Curated annotation (Swiss-Prot):
UniProt lineage: Eukaryota, Metazoa, Ecdysozoa, Nematoda, Chromadorea
Protein family according to the UniProt entry: Belongs to the eukaryotic ribosomal protein eL19 family.
GO molecular function annotations of the record: RNA binding; structural constituent of ribosome
Keywords: Ribonucleoprotein, Ribosomal protein
Bias type Basic and acidic residues, positions: 160-177
Any one biological process term the GO annotation gives: translation
Matching PROSITE patterns: RIBOSOMAL_L19E
Xref: InterPro entries: 60S_ribosomal_eL19_sf, Ribosomal_eL19, Ribosomal_eL19_CS, Ribosomal_eL19_dom, Ribosomal_eL19_dom1, Ribosomal_eL19_euk
GO cellular component terms, A-Z: cytosolic large ribosomal subunit
Domain of life: Eukaryota
Protein name: Large ribosomal subunit protein eL19
Annotated region (Disordered), positions in chain: 66-85, 150-177
Ranges of compositional bias, category Basic residues: 71-83
HAMAP family the UniProt entry points to: Ribosomal_eL19
Taxonomic source organism: Caenorhabditis elegans
Chain's gene name: rpl-19
Length: 198
């Protein structure tokens, strides 16, 4: 059998594929070995003596199946783990994810006028200080804080109303005393006049 390395190389260039994908008809070796130009190779391709083999199928079925199982949590036991917990799921990534969730919630509440800017800023700094484990935790804290603020405001209003009432009553008492004193002085002066007239 003659060496068909040249023909294979030319055929791969003509067919625009790798040399492994070129098939040369083993029954027509003598005719193929005579072809030493691209033109003659093209003729042999048209005659069907040289064929471009189809791409070998490399199925991803098993890989997809395995990936699907991993999504469900299979194949992730202690024996399958190579890196540290921090390498597999970095703490920084978890922190960034949590901060984004909490800050988006705070921003949304502030824009919806559920939080004033002072409470927003306080909660923002608390979130940064790792005060809230998750979104639910933050919502509960906001609800509690708003209730406390509302109660404090009510108590402050009640205290102010009481102070105003006491102030008003004190003022009225003083006015009454002034009137009474004036009345008393008038009576005394009248009685003195009467005594002086006798």
């Amino acid at each position: 059998m003659s060496n068909l390395r040249l023909q294979k190389r030319l055929a791969s260039a003509v067919l625009k594929c790798g040399k492994h994908r070129v098939w040369l008809d083993p029954n027509e070796v003598s005719e193929i070995s005579g072809a030493n130009s691209r033109q003659s190779i093209r003729r042999l391709v048209n005659d069907g003596l040289i064929i471009r083999k189809p791409v070998t199928v490399h199925s991803r079925f098993r890989a997809r199946e395995y990936e699907e199982a991993r999504r469900k949590g299979r194949h992730t036991g202690y024996g399958k783990r190579r890196g540290t917990a921090n390498a597999r799921m970095p703490e920084k990534t978890l922190w960034i994810r949590r901060m984004r969730v909490l800050r988006n919630l705070l921003r949304r509440y502030r824009d919806a006028k559920k939080l004033d800017k002072h409470l927003y800023h306080e909660l923002y700094l608390r979130a940064k200080g790792n005060n809230f484990k998750n979104k639910k935790n933050l919502i509960e804290y906001i609800f509690k804080k708003k209730t406390e603020n509302k109660r404090a405001k009510q108590l402050a209003d009640q205290a102010q109303a009481r102070r105003d009432k006491n102030k008003e009553s004190r003022k009225r008492r003083e006015e009454r005393q002034v009137v009474k004193r004036a009345e008393l002085l008038r009576k005394i002066s009248q009685s003195e006049k009467v005594i002086a007239g006798k």
